[in-house]
């Protein structure tokens, strides 16, 4: 199954500004789609039921078919400025909004307007989010391009009426968040954010107490600079997009397996296995 990675361009990274495909051995296959609506792409999430890949691109959301053709297009959504994207338990497609600093839920047909599921400005700078089995929404809050932020994870109740600061970890600066198969919250971290000598890790937290359960590091097996998007594979491994590579971790054993993709100037933002 091909591995797809969004590569940032412009002010956010000297990358390719494209959705790139790699084969099972990590060999680059070029852009998955040449559609000119794909501009400096960010989050992406597969919809296995419909065999579509949802992709956040500039001021719109696209859904691509297995051939890389655009099957659905939200049209321009003014001020979207999207970050990550995932499907929620209600079947809607959720998008992190970096400018509005909230999360938007869109219907999967992309034909109707979405709605904010959290108040605008709910965190200083959203960096990634995920849903727990009980409907909780976990939102990582990191440092923005202006250097401001609060480096934590906020947990919202299933009805979104209550919020608690879940994590107090002085060594955390989150870049993306995923909920692991064991229910724990997993975050890619670069601390201090943007620093030349930043410590890069994957950090795992208990979803109820916020207790730090484990810290995964590259252990010299990968450069692991500027870690960003996280994704669990069907093999149970955890994959993380980074500056010049995609790094795999044996999540059960808690050890790094090294890069599965190497590409100079990748500036990986998000990844998915599709179709």
Where in the sequence are the language-model features?
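Blade-level signature of beta-propeller repeat domains, shared across WD40, Kelch, NHL, RCC1
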Residues: 243-275
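Beta-rich, blade/repeat-based domains predominating
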Residues: 14-16, 35-50, 58, 77-93, ...
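Short loop/turn segments immediately following the C-termini of beta-strands
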Residues: 8-10, 56-58, 98-99, 142-144, ...
């Amino acid at each position: 199954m091909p591995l797809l990675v969004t590569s940032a361009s412009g002010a956010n990274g000297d990358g390719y500004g494209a959705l790139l495909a790699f084969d099972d051995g990590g060999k680059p296959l070029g852009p998955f789609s040449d559609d000119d609506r794909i501009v400096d792409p960010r989050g992406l999430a597969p919809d296995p039921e419909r065999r579509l890949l949802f992709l956040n691109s500039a001021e719109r959301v696209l859904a691509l078919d297995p051939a890389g053709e655009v099957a659905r297009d939200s049209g321009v959504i003014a001020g979207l400025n999207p970050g990550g994207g995932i499907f929620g338990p209600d079947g809607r497609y959720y998008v992190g909004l970096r400018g509005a600093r909230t999360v938007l839920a869109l219907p999967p047909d992309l034909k109707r307007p979405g709605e904010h599921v959290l108040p605008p400005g709910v965190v200083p700078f959203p960096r990634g989010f995920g849903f727990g089995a009980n409907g909780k929404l976990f939102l990582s809050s990191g440092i923005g391009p202006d250097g401001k932020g609060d480096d934590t994870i906020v947990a919202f109740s299933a009805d979104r009426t209550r919020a608690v600061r879940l994590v107090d970890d002085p060594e955390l600066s989150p870049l993306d968040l995923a909920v692991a198969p064991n229910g724990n919250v997993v975050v890619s971290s670069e601390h201090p954010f943007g620093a030349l000598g930043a410590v890069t890790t994957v950090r795992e937290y208990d979803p109820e107490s916020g207790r730090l359960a484990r810290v995964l590091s590259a252990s010299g097996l990968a450069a692991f600079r500027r870690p960003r998007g996280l994704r669990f594979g069907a093999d149970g491994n955890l994959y993380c997009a980074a500056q010049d590579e995609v790094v795999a971790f044996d999540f059960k054993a808690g050890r790094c397996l090294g890069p599965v993709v190497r590409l100079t100037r990748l500036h990986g933002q998000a990844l998915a296995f599709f179709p």
